[in-house]
Regions:
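Glycine-rich loop(s) and the adjacent beta-strand/alpha-helix scaffold that form part
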Residues: 163-209
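A glycine-rich dinucleotide-binding beta-alpha-beta segment and adjacent secondary-structure elements
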Residues: 127-129, 134, 312-392
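Conserved N-terminal/central alpha/beta ligand/cofactor-binding core
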Residues: 32-125
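Short hydrophobic core segments
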Residues: 5-7, 132, 158-174, 187, ...
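An anion/pyrophosphate-binding glycine-rich loop and adjacent beta-alpha core
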Residues: 34-36, 41-42, 50, 56-57, ...
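A conserved FAD-binding loop/helix module that cradles the flavin
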Residues: 172-185, 189, 390-415
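N-terminal Rossmann-like FAD-binding beta1-loop-alpha1 element of flavoenzymes
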Residues: 3-29, 410-414
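A conserved short coil-to-beta-strand element within the FAD-binding core of flavoproteins
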Residues: 128-147
């Protein structure tokens, strides 16, 4: 039986602790916050998108960075195993649009409670308010290679260990304690940490009219983002207007797919509000609506086309006098209005910061970590898992799957 210390009580850390304990080791889980799963509690707007039930090809293709590194981890512990784990732990789950898996209760607290029940059953020693200051090392006996032998806490206490698993998360949602401690531990161990940037993060928008639509969610729209004439992103789905710009699944995914240096630039964005219709079909629909409302003012004739919050903005951008009678609207004005519906314009003005990022892009360089075990190639008995690694995926439960899979593999492979 080895003494295993896991640093970080998030999803990867809890799964690593459970796997190591169920493999016969004595496990101490160190968490610097007052409770486990503080960031997990707020994921998925407090509902916790546990994983995604799509097939393995979709799983891999949803990983944006270093997907090949995850072959062993995903095949050793896949999404169905995650679903089975939680159901066996007393947490019923449900499958929603896009194969996103949520607890039936819609409460992330129930996910954390299920994990805590398993940690207790497996006799994992949980120590809260326990911030690690540094890792401890000794000579491994192998030429030029050291091994980790424990940790020192911020209060000076030393905890001896045969294996240490670093599962400290990234820099996103720093109010939950994600302050990048693991990057420092990795650098002190001799590891390379790639550039750290926010990902799955909203965009700022230049136009003031976004504020008029704050809180408005648009479903079944198509978003296209341009750099000059080049299309950088073109996807169908759901988005949200905020007081500063745009957010929601489509926008968060765009932030992960557009190169960070380019995302800093002003970029043109168009929203197709009626993607199921061609411009010609939409014109016929608008003509029909106008015919039915021919004696009404323009401002009172378009309620069937848009949510109420959007109508004043659409009127303003159309250039049509809101008090104009519908039967006085010219063909040119109507066609301009149709084009506006098919290409609602915004100017993106860079990404929001880490405090609003769901995940971190960048981390411990994966070429320095064994993908079959999650053990450091530089320091014996030191393991990394979860967001501290240079791994990230699009929104939809895929980032938590990375955490579960890499955490489980690290816990299973401690010696």
């Amino acid at each position: 039986m080895s003494r295993v210390v896991v640093i970080g009580g998030g999803p990867a850390g809890m799964f690593a602790a459970i796997a190591a304990a169920e493999n016969g080791h004595h496990v101490t889980l160190l968490e610097k916050n007052e409770k486990l799963g503080k960031k997990l509690f707020i994921t998925g707007k407090g509902r916790c998108n546990i994983t995604n039930s799509s097939d393995m090809d979709v799983l891999f293709n949803s990983v944006m960075t270093n997907r090949k590194f995850l072959y062993s981890a995903f095949y050793a512990y896949d999404n169905q195993m995650v679903i089975d784990f939680f159901e066996q732990a007393g947490l019923p789950v449900k499958n929603e649009r896009g194969n996103r898996i949520f607890p039936v209760s819609d409460h992330s607290s129930d996910v954390i409670a299920a994990l805590q029940r398993v940690l207790k059953k497996d006799q994992v020693e949980i120590r809260l308010h326990s911030e690690v200051d540094t890792l401890l090392y000794e000579d491994s006996g192998e030429a030029g290679q050291k091994k980790v032998c424990g940790v020192r806490l911020s209060d000076g206490e030393k905890i001896q260990a045969d294996d240490v698993i670093v599962a400290t998360g990234g820099f996103s949602y720093q109010t939950t304690g994600s302050t990048g401690d693991g990057y420092r531990f990795a650098k002190e161990a001799g590891h390379t940490v790639t550039e750290i940037r926010p990902s799955l993060v909203p965009f700022n928008a230049k136009e003031d009219y976004v504020r008029e639509m704050q809180g408005l969610s648009l479903k079944n729209v198509n978003v296209r983002i341009y750099r000059g004439k080049k299309v950088l992103y073109d996807e169908f789905g759901e988005m949200l207007f905020t007081h500063f710009g745009v957010s929601g699944p489509l926008i968060l995914t765009a932030s992960a797919m557009i190169r960070p240096d380019i995302a800093k630039e002003p970029l043109a964005m168009e929203i197709d509000l009626k993607p199921a219709l061609t411009e010609e079909q939409l014109d016929k629909r608008v003509l029909k609506d106008f015919e039915e409302a021919k004696n009404k003012q323009f401002k009172n004739s378009i309620g069937k086309l848009f949510p109420a919050k959007m109508i004043p903005v659409m009127i303003e951008l159309s250039g049509i006098d809101p008090d104009k009678k519908v039967n006085e609207i010219t063909k040119e004005e109507r066609l301009k209005f149709v084009r506006l519906i098919k290409a609602f314009p915004l100017t993106l003005n860079g990404l929001r910061d880490f405090n609003e990022a769901i995940i971190t892009k960048g981390g411990v360089k994966v070429s320095e970590v064994n993908p079959s075990t999650m053990e450091s190639k530089l320091v014996r008995h030191l393991y990394f898992c979860g967001e501290v690694l240079d791994l990230d995926a699009v929104t939809g439960g895929f980032n938590l799957q990375i955490a579960w899979s890499t955490g489980h593999l690290a816990g299973m492979c401690v010696e």
